[in-house]
Amino acid sequence: MATVDRWLLPDGIEEVLPPEAARIEAARRQVLDLFQRWGYEFVVTPHIEYLESLLTGAGQDLDLRTFKVTDPLSGRQMGFRADITPQVARIDAHTLRREGPNRLCYAGSVLHAQPRALTTSRSPIQLGAELYGDASPASDIEVISLLVETLELAAVPDVHMDLGHVGIYRGLARAAGLSGEVEQQLFDALQRKAMDEIEALTAALPAGLGNMLRSLAELCGGREVLDLAQAALVEAPDAVHAALDELVAIADALELRYPELPLYFDLGELRGYNYHTGVVFAAFVPGEGGAIAQGGRYDDTGAVFGRARPATGFSTDLKTLVTLGDMRLDEAVRGVWAPDNHDLYLWQAVRRLRSEGERVVQALPGQSEADAREAGCDRLLALRDGRWQVAPLAS
């Protein structure tokens, strides 16, 4: 092996160096503290599991993004987690088994066999919050509000929120009696706003249903879209009206809470259609090709673990938040340099400073004040008037 190969990392895998690693960790702590203030309890899930557990109830997309290995102890197939959300759903449904609403949050590295896009990391730090046990729009409003405040805490500028509801398309598709294959083809065409394909796939449907399905591709824009949708879908089944009413209620609450937050509605955007069951949402910023955070309702996911539960939540990549945002973090390199000296009073001074929250670096044999700057210190402990005192480090 050539020497150069010994330090090369795989595509999409990166190491994080100081001080960036310190910024990411400080951001993680601040966001988890925010989640805790909202009542969300922190959980830690395994990095690797048997595939049967890891992929139960998950879609093909997660299967393709999961690194797979063979367990040398059991011979069974295992996978490195590519998404923490299903693991947390299992904790709620099978492990905790609480009856009422349950709020859980998490932060941890995940590993992707395939990147989501050409320039994205294959080792993001997934951060998220999930609310289980309540099927009302109040839960969706809470998690979207928590996402907004997470992005505000991270000081990510120029955020706009996209909202949709998979129940609208699903209700129309069922009323039209679309086969699974045609429903998927029409879904794909709607994502691409491919009007010729949409026309062809809906041509044989009753005029009313065909017109309503075709209208989804054009129902995108600001708040006025919801008014247009109520007119365009007036003859839709009750399930569609219920979904639209949920979206209106969520939009009303977000506009009241965050009047400066731009909201964009796209009733043909069916992100996570095979996974989500209700409202879907994503946060975007200018200059980023994809969503920087996303989420939605995914009721009954826990059924595969023995207990169906309403669920809604969101996730994001902590590294992305730190890169895009301007979170107030204590980035200044500060510390106290203690000389290489075994004096008991020096040791007591070092312990006192550390107990007060100071960062103290003790010199090793052969080191001097000249090494203090490289160690991130801006002050030193100096013996003056018979006492060890903190003094500025000479420049």
From Swiss-Prot:
One of its GO terms (biological process) is L-histidine biosynthetic process. The keyword Coiled coil does not apply. Coiled coil: none annotated. Its main location: cytoplasm. Keywords: Amino-acid biosynthesis, Cytoplasm, Histidine biosynthesis. It comes from the Bacteria. GO terms for cellular component: cytoplasm. SUPFAM superfamilies: Class II aaRS and biotin synthetases. It is found in: Cytoplasm. InterPro entries: aa-tRNA-synth_II/BPL/LPL, HisRS-like_core, HisRS/HisZ, HisZ. It holds the Pfam family tRNA-synt_His. Pathway: Amino-acid biosynthesis; L-histidine biosynthesis; L-histidine from 5-phospho-alpha-D-ribose 1-diphosphate: step 1/9. Heteromultimer composed of HisG and HisZ subunits. Required for the first step of histidine biosynthesis. May allow the feedback regulation of ATP phosphoribosyltransferase activity by histidine. Belongs to the class-II aminoacyl-tRNA synthetase family. HisZ subfamily. This function is generally fulfilled by the C-terminal part of HisG, which is missing in some bacteria such as this one. This is ATP phosphoribosyltransferase regulatory subunit. It comes from Ectopseudomonas mendocina (strain ymp). The lineage of its organism: Bacteria, Pseudomonadati, Pseudomonadota, Gammaproteobacteria, Pseudomonadales.
